[in-house]
Amino acid sequence: MTIPTLTTERLLLKPLVAEDAVQIQTLYPRWEIVRYMVSSVPWPYPDNGAENYVNNVALPDMAKGIAWFWSIRRREVPDELMGIICLYDVEDNNRGFWLAPEFQGQGYMREASIAATDYWFNTLNKPVLRAPKAAANSR
């Protein structure tokens, strides 16, 4: 199944591609993002961390049909990546995301989460979505 671009009022959720690693590497390695991620994310974040994750984890899992990754972008600035949202077909953690701090507090992740959740239930026809998150990570 080809992963589609999802659109919302303000956002484009574009399927992750290898070229996104450059922008991810610029935005992601910040403690205010990484501290809320799973414990397997290394800190300090390595210089090739995004390239390694995109090419060796995310894209292969997308090809296997067990994950759906999107870069989050504003429709008005479609070349600028703001964060990532993903869905995983695993038992206890089906949705993950991060957003660069300068874009937080503006409702972007809520908008992206609604679109991804809709895709999970209405396109993939999954009966349940589990998304355990850090309670302190809220705005």
What do these predicted regions represent?
Residues 1-2, 56-60:
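Short, P/G- and charge-enriched loop/turn segments at secondary-structure junctions
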Residues 34-56, 68-70:
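Conserved GNAT-fold acetyl-CoA-binding loop/helix
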Residues 60-66:
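Short loop/turn motifs at secondary-structure junctions and domain boundaries
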